Amino acid sequence: MKKIIKVEAVEKHFGNQVIIPPLSLDIKEGEFLTILGPSGCGKTTLLRMIAGFETPTKGNLLLDDEKINDLPPYKRHMNLVFQHYALFPHMNVEKNICFGMKMQKVPVAEQKERAEEAMRLTQLLEFRNRKPAKLSGGQQQRVAIARAIVNNPRVLLLDEPLGALDFKLRKDLQRELKNLQRNLGITFIYVTHDQEEAMSMSDRIVVMNKGHIEQIGTPKEIYNKPKTLFVATFIGENNIVKNGEGYVAIRPENVKVRSVEEPILKEYHLGHIEDIEFVGNMEKLYVRDEKTSELLMAYQTAEEAAQWSIGDNVYVGWEQEDEVTLN
């Protein structure tokens, strides 16, 4: 797949503080790429440099192999959608969507045609004459997205656009965004701290920490094969166990809990259940390993967990193939 954006050894300094040390990243044309990390990791700064709102201190940004470090945002063929939608309150939906085209002196007939298609894609046709104050948060977000895609950008940049919405609406819009990206075929670069959001929408995920890229991969690769201690502890839940000079990670769904009355493999250790936590369709057992004193997590169905009580002695273990060695 063709590379549309290349980030080559880019750094960002604010005064003497290095926010992003040398960082390189290739972004493929037509992919949904999510930059994921905790607050302060540099993900939004990286997005703003790609958009042209921040200038790299060192290194180069390339679009279609052309250097764009000094190119102003409006010449980059990219649009940016923020968490705060910045809609014009005195304009209705259609006029908000057409505003950028009007400034670019696009013919009125073409404005209408392109706005119509953008509203169709974002399910806004019935709201075209409403002003922002008469729209829900999700509808306002759709207007911001429609306004961003109506100019046919090469790349759409999204900075935590769903962060202010409630859980159910967020889930609905996640599906809509992924379908929209698939239908448009343009590159989406999405910034979030929400792991579930990243996992559900992305073709690839870039996990950042303290300005560094910890790992790049598909959602399955990131979840099943974390490369570093940070990724293993940041993405989902993991049991981190000392193994010689390093560590291994074992997902709770791979940890087995057995009765002390069962014949057991030698790799299993004696432990006792310290707590049982209800987590929806599963129950989470906290088991203290008597040999290592590690507190291990194990997921079980409600039916499996019904046999246990806090304080029970059990055997706990896992298959070696379920261990992931961490750097």
UniProtKB/Swiss-Prot annotation:
It is an enzyme of class 7 (translocase). Transmembrane segments: none annotated. SMART domains: AAA. ATP binds at G37, P38, S39, G40, C41, G42, K43, T44. It comes from the Bacteria. GO terms for molecular function: ABC-type putrescine transporter activity; ATP binding; ATP hydrolysis activity. It catalyses: ATP + H2O + polyamine-[polyamine-binding protein]Side 1 = ADP + phosphate + polyamineSide 2 + [polyamine-binding protein]Side 1. Gene3D superfamilies: P-loop containing nucleotide triphosphate hydrolases. PANTHER family: SPERMIDINE/PUTRESCINE IMPORT ATP-BINDING PROTEIN POTA, SPERMIDINE_PUTRESCINE IMPORT ATP-BINDING PROTEIN POTA. Part of the ABC transporter complex PotABCD involved in spermidine/putrescine import. Responsible for energy coupling to the transport system. This is Spermidine/putrescine import ATP-binding protein PotA.
